[in-house]
Amino acid sequence: MATVSMRDMLKAGVHFGHQTRYWNPKMKPFIFGARNKVHIINLENTVPMFNDALAELGKIASRKGKILFVGTKRAASEAVKDSANNCDQFFVNHRWLGGMLTNWKTVRQSIKRLKDLEIQSQDGTFDKLTKKEALMRTRELDKLEKSLGGIKDMGGLPDALFVIDADHEHIAIKEANNLGIPVFAVVDTNSDPDGVDFIIPGNDDAIRAINLYLGAVATAVREGRSQDLAVQAEEGLVEAE
């Protein structure tokens, strides 16, 4: 089972919060103290809370659940995409479009347009267009791929959100709350933990910390999915490799 130790977290700087003047008092239970006007997060809370989150995400994956990774700020963007791809899940790593979950019907139409344009770009349709029209469609394809590429094969709403930076992604969290989709999120000392079902108190800016969270979640999801395949193999539903 995927787990992360206190040593791993210390090495990655998970315990460094934000400057004390930017704190959210709701995070007080998770703060150990302050050093040089920077809040220090109590890892004695974070370690078990993160490992509980990993276990739950693994369970969701073992039931064929779809997990949407969300991290649109620059520090997290590439790692979010890589980790989601690494465990065959889904991601939003650029701008969160308002209504991405709550207005899924419209989003589905945009995904259909994206897939149509992908086919056109590959089957020679673009070559038959005027230069201007081909350029316009290429730009439209790039724009749609950037915003929806990570969810184009999701085929419906996700079963859980894993979020890097609850403060930055508050719109995504609100939408998930409205739909009853469980939210797992890294919550720093400047963020509001309300609306997060599985709080992971920790640094949400350091690349090493972000990579630690994402790597562990991807491992937990892969393990969960392999459990599902093992069960199916036992029941004769799939051939064991």
From Swiss-Prot:
One of its GO terms (biological process) is translation. The keyword Ribonucleoprotein applies. Pfam families: Ribosomal_S2. GO terms for cellular component: cytosolic small ribosomal subunit. SUPFAM superfamilies: Ribosomal protein S2. GO terms for molecular function: structural constituent of ribosome. CDD domains: RPS2 (cd01425). It comes from the Bacteria. Keywords: Ribonucleoprotein, Ribosomal protein. Belongs to the universal ribosomal protein uS2 family. HAMAP family: Ribosomal_uS2_B. This is Small ribosomal subunit protein uS2. It comes from Pectobacterium atrosepticum (strain SCRI 1043 / ATCC BAA-672). The lineage of its organism: Bacteria, Pseudomonadati, Pseudomonadota, Gammaproteobacteria, Enterobacterales. The gene is rpsB.
